[in-house]
Swiss-Prot record:
Gene name as annotated: SIFV0022
Residue ranges the record marks as coiled coil: none
Residue ranges of domain Helicase C-terminal in the record: 410-552
The keyword Transport appears for this protein: no
Name of the protein in its database record: Putative helicase 22
PANTHER family: GENERAL TRANSCRIPTION AND DNA REPAIR FACTOR IIH HELICASE SUBUNIT XPB, RAD25/XP-B DNA REPAIR HELICASE
Keywords: ATP-binding, Helicase, Hydrolase, Nucleotide-binding
Its EC number(s): 3.6.4.-
Source superkingdom: Viruses
A matching Pfam family: Helicase_C
Residue window of motif DEAH box: 300-303
Length: 559
C-alpha cells in the first residue's frame, strides 16, 4: 500500500533512553510506523495499523507513550476511538464526572513521580492515578477532558459561551501571534473553562494576560479578575502594564498589600506564596472570597502549578475561567498531567523561530566553558571522591559544588572569561547568597562595576539594582534564583550560569533573560560554566542535547 505524501510524523523520545529502552522503543515503532532517514523521524504507516485490532494498537500506543509522551494518543485518536459509544459527562467546579469504566482511561490519567534516592544515588519512580473511582464511574480534573476525548466521544455541555472580541490596546502594539493565541484560548475555554499559552520570554506575556482580561470584561462588564504569580517583581511589572490599559490591579503580596491600605478593586495582582501562607494560618478569609468569586484567574509561570501553593489557590476558585502562561509548561518530573488537569491543554504555542525571524527576540551564542582545575583543588576533589559515603550522595554533591565555588583560582578564570567576552550588561546566576557576595567583591577588585541581589534583598533596593544594570550604571549583577523568572532587562547581553544541574525549566528561563531585543543588540550570549568533574560534565551533555533541540535554528553552540 502506498504511503500518503503528507506523512504524519511521531514525536521523538522525550527522555534519554538506555540501550535496552531504545531497542524496545524501536521495535514498538516498527509495529505502526516507518523510519524517514531524511528527517530521522518515524511516520505513521496506515497499512501496518490496519492489520492490528484496536486493543492491540492501544497496547502498543500505551507502551510508546512511555517514551514519547501522551501526545501520541492525540495523533492516533482516530484509530483507537470508539465512535459508536457516546459517554455521558458533566463538569462541576474543578472536576469532570464521567459515567464510564475508569479502567479504560487509567494509562491516560496516570503519571510517574521521579524522586532521587540519595542513599542509592539514583532516581526511583512512583505511579500516581489522577482520578477517583465512583459508583457511577469516575471523577478527574476538568482539564484532563482533552486526554479522555482521544479514546472516547463525550456528551458534554460547554463550560461557557465566550464571544471573541477584536480588542485594540491603547499603549501596546499587538502582534499577530498574541491575538491568535487569545483566539485559540477562548475556543478552548468555551469547551472546558481553561487553557495554556506557551509563551517564551520576550513574547509579551503581560500583553497576552491583559488581552485575556479585556476579553472577559467584554463578555461580562463586572468581571472579577485575579492575576497570580510568585514574584513581587512580576506582580509590580504586570500592575504597571495593566494600568496603561485602565485596568487598576491592586497588588497583594508579603511586601506590599494594597488591600490592607484600603485600596479596593475587582482586579487583584496576587502573590501565590502570600495567599498560601495566609491560608495556612487561617487568615485568608478576605482573600479567599476574592479568589473564590473570580471570573478569571491568570496563572503566570504556570509550570509551578503542581506545587501545593498554586494548586491550593486554583482549587479555591473552582468555577473560574483560567489562563496559564509559561515558556515551559512541560515538566521533567512527569507532573504536567496536574498542570493540564488544573489549567487545560496548551491552546497555543508561540514559536522561537518566528520570534527571532521577526526580530522580537535575538539569536543565541552559547559558550560552554570548563575552567582548568588548579592543583590544590584537584587534590581536594580527589579526597572527596575517595572518601564519599555511598549512602549520602547529597552531602557529597553539595561538598563537590562548594569546593569549586570557593576556589579562588576557578573564580578568577571565570571572571577573566567574562572580561574577555566584554558583553555588558551581564547577569551572573549563582546558587547561594554567599557566593554572590564574594564574586561581586572579586569583580570589583578586578575593575568590573558589580553588585549582587537576592530574594532577601528588600524590594526597593532590588528594583534599584536592577534599574542600575538596565541603565548600564552596573556592568554585572550577580543574583541567586531570583533571576529565574520575571526579570525584564532588554539590553542584557550576557548571562553567566554558575549553577550546574540539568533542570530544563530553569535553563529556558535563564536563556530567555538574554534573548530580548534592544537597540544595537544583534545576539544574546550565554556563558555556561561547567565545573571540571565527570558528574557535572555528564549533566552538561544531557543539557546540550536538549538545548540543540529546543533552540534549533536560532542558537550557535561553542564547545
Amino acid at each position: 500500500m502506498t504511503q500518503n505524501i503528507n506523512k504524519i510524523y511521531l514525536p521523538s523520545p522525550n527522555k534519554y533512553l538506555s540501550r535496552e529502552d531504545f531497542l524496545n522503543y524501536t521495535n514498538l515503532m516498527r509495529e505502526i510506523a516507518n523510519f524517514d532517514p531524511s528527517t530521522k523521524k518515524w511516520y505513521i504507516n496506515e497499512y501496518k495499523i490496519s492489520r492490528l485490532t484496536k486493543d492491540e494498537l492501544k497496547g502498543i500506543i500505551d507502551q510508546i507513550a512511555e517514551y514519547i509522551g501522551n501526545s501520541i494518543y492525540n495523533i492516533l485518536s482516530n484509530y483507537i476511538k470508539d465512535d459508536n459509544n457516546i459517554i455521558n459527562a458533566y463538569i462541576k467546579g474543578n472536576y469532570i464526572y464521567i459515567r464510564d469504566n475508569l479502567e479504560k482511561y487509567k494509562n491516560l490519567l496516570t503519571y510517574k513521580i521521579k524522586t532521587f534516592d540519595y542513599k542509592e544515588g539514583k532516581y526511583t519512580e512512583e505511579e500516581i492515578l489522577l482520578a477517583w473511582q465512583k459508583s457511577y464511574g469516575f471523577v478527574t480534573l476538568r482539564g484532563l477532558y482533552w486526554k479522555l476525548k482521544n479514546i472516547a466521544n463525550f456528551d458534554l455541555k460547554p463550560f461557557t459561551n465566550l464571544r471573541f472580541y477584536d480588542i485594540q490596546l491603547k499603549n501596546f502594539e499587538m502582534r499577530n501571534y498574541q491575538i491568535n493565541s487569545i483566539k485559540s484560548w477562548v475556543s478552548d475555554v468555551n469547551v472546558i473553562g481553561n487553557g495554556i499559552i506557551k509563551a517564551p520570554t520576550g513574547s509579551g506575556k503581560s500583553v497576552i494576560a491583559i488581552l485575556s482580561a479585556l476579553e472577559i470584561l467584554k463578555n461580562k462588564n463586572n468581571a472579577k479578575i485575579v492575576y497570580a504569580v510568585n514574584s513581587t517583581t512580576l506582580l509590580k511589572q504586570f500592575q504597571n502594564f495593566a494600568k496603561k490599559e485602565d485596568l487598576p490591579f491592586v497588588l497583594v503580596s508579603g511586601e506590599i498589600d494594597e488591600i490592607k491600605k484600603g485600596e479596593r478593586s475587582d482586579f487583584i495582582a496576587l502573590s501565590i506564596s502570600y495567599y498560601y501562607s495566609k491560608k495556612k494560618r487561617n487568615e485568608h478569609e478576605k482573600l479567599k472570597e476574592l479568589v473564590t468569586n473570580a471570573d478569571l484567574v491568570i496563572i503566570d509561570e504556570a509550570h509551578h502549578t503542581p506545587a501545593n501553593i498554586v494548586k491550593s489557590l486554583l482549587l479555591d476558585s473552582p468555577n473560574s475561567i483560567r489562563l496559564g502562561l509559561s515558556a515551559t509548561p512541560i515538566r521533567e518530573d512527569g507532573k504536567e498531567l496536574e498542570i493540564m488537569g488544573l489549567l487545560g491543554k496548551i491552546s497555543f504555542t508561540i514559536d522561537y523561530t518566528e520570534l527571532v525571524r521577526n526580530r522580537y527576540l535575538v539569536p543565541i551564542e552559547y559558550i560552554r566553558y570548563i575552567p582548568e582545575i588548579p592543583k590544590k583543588l584537584k587534590l581536594k576533589i580527589q579526597d572527596l571522591d575517595d572518601n564519599k559515603d555511598p549512602e549520602n550522595f547529597a552531602k557529597y554533591y553539595s561538598s563537590l559544588l562548594r569546593s569549586f565555588e570557593h576556589s579562588p583560582n576557578t573564580n578568577k578564570q571565570i571572571i577573566s572569561k567574562i572580561k574577555q567576552l566584554n558583553q555588558y550588561p551581564c547577569l551572573v546566576i549563582v546558587r547561594r547568597i554567599a557566593i554572590a557576595k564574594k564574586l561581586a567583591e572579586i569583580m570589583r577588585e578586578n575593575g568590573i562595576i558589580a553588585d549582587w541581589v537576592s530574594s532577601k534583598t528588600k524590594l526597593e533596593e532590588r528594583m534599584e539594582k536592577i534599574e542600575a544594570l538596565k541603565n548600564e550604571k552596573l556592568q554585572v549583577l550577580i543574583s541567586t534564583s531570583l533571576a529565574d523568572e520575571g526579570l525584564d532587562i532588554p539590553n542584557l547581553r550576557l548571562v553567566v550560569l554558575l549553577t550546574q544541574g540539568k533542570s530544563r525549566i530553569k535553563l529556558i528561563q535563564r536563556i530567555g533573560r538574554v534573548m530580548r531585543v534592544s537597540q544595537n543588540k544583534r545576539k544574546g550570549y550565554i556563558l555556561d560554566v561547567i565545573y571540571n568533574h565527570d558528574l557535572f560534565i555528564k549533566q552538561s551533555v544531557k543539557k546540550m542535547n536538549f538545548i540543540e533541540n529546543e533552540y534549533n535554528g536560532i542558537i550557535t553552540i561553542h564547545y
